[in-house]
């Protein structure tokens, strides 16, 4: 499979970087399922560079926050979901070079392939230029996300938030069990079952890795817990029948009583 030159030109413009060695970009876009030099080594390099650049940016932006907050914010910015979003901003999928199997199964849209390609492009830019140029490019890609990110509980992953919620109430931790694995080794899908005593339902979730499936399951449980808590609030707020009867505004007047009062006045 070859890249459409027009798509490649559009991608270069969106990336904001013109390669001195265009073949580096082609390699960064080549999945290992395709023939020829693929992007895994570039991905390894780009992953490390991205982590460093984002860590430094957060270190400078939040001078009073501790290592825990900085780590959670960095994880939020460099996680697969975020990188896949960046890739979609560039319409990266239309430029990926995939093998026949990946092409047929819709690899252009697969989150894991998109995130790997972004990291590979970062590695390619570094080799084609230098760390300062690479840093400036990464910061331009993540500018909006760096502006809005804040330290706090929202940066914790779903499994951590669920664990802290349960521990704070002395409830046993959930159990995660892989109940199915499908696909080839390079393109697997994991199905995880999660149970916790805090809800009656058994949650089933899927992901391209065991970790992602477990995180998705934890997120679903958190959503169910929040839903139950909202319903409990509604029940507490809604006035009962007895409360309405006790309220003078809802009490019917007694005609005979009114007559007695009238005659007394006379």
Curated annotation (Swiss-Prot):
The keyword Manganese does not apply. Keywords: Cytoplasm, Endonuclease, Hydrolase, Magnesium, Metal-binding, mRNA processing, Nuclease, RNA-binding, rRNA processing, rRNA-binding, tRNA processing. The active site is at 47, 119. GO terms for biological process: mRNA processing; regulation of gene expression; rRNA processing; tRNA processing. Its main location: cytoplasm. One of its GO terms (cellular component) is cytoplasm. SUPFAM superfamilies: dsRNA-binding domain-like, RNase III domain-like. Residues 8-130 form the RNase III domain. It is an enzyme of class 3 (hydrolase). Pfam families: dsrm, Ribonucleas_3_3. Residues 157-227 form the DRBM domain. Residues 229-266 are annotated as: Disordered. Residues 253-266 have a biased composition (Low complexity). It is found in: Cytoplasm. PROSITE patterns: DS_RBD, RNASE_3_1, RNASE_3_2. NCBIfam families: RNaseIII. Belongs to the ribonuclease III family. Homodimer. This is Ribonuclease 3. It comes from Colwellia psychrerythraea (strain 34H / ATCC BAA-681).
């Amino acid at each position: 499979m070859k890249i459409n030159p027009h798509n490649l030109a559009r991608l270069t413009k969106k990336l904001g970087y013109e390669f001195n060695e265009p073949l580096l970009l082609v390699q960064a876009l080549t999945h290992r399922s395709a023939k020829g030099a693929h992007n895994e080594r570039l991905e390894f390099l780009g992953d490390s560079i991205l982590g460093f650049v984002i860590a430094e940016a957060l270190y400078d932006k939040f001078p009073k926050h501790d290592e825990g907050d900085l780590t959670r914010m960095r994880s939020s910015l460099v996680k697969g979901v975020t990188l896949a979003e960046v890739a979609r901003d560039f319409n990266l999928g239309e430029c990926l070079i995939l093998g026949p199997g990946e092409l047929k199964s819709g690899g252009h849209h697969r989150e894991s392939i998109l995130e790997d390609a972004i990291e590979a492009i970062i590695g390619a830019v570094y080799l084609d230029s230098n760390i300062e140029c690479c840093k400036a490019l990464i910061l331009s890609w993540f500018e909006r996300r760096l502006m809005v990110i804040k330290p706090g509980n929202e940066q914790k992953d779903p499994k951590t938030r669920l664990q802290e919620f349960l521990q704070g109430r002395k409830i046993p931790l959930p159990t995660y069990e892989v109940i199915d694995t499908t696909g080839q080794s390079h393109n697997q899908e994991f199905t995880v079952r999660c149970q916790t005593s805090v809800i009656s339902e058994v949650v089933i979730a899927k992901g391209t890795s065991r970790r992602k499936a477990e995180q998705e399951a934890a997120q679903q449980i958190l959503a169910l817990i929040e839903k139950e808590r909202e319903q409990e609030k509604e029940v507490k707020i809604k006035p009962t029948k007895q409360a309405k009867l006790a309220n003078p505004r809802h009490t019917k007047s007694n005609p005979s009583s009114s007559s007695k009062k009238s005659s007394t006045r006379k």
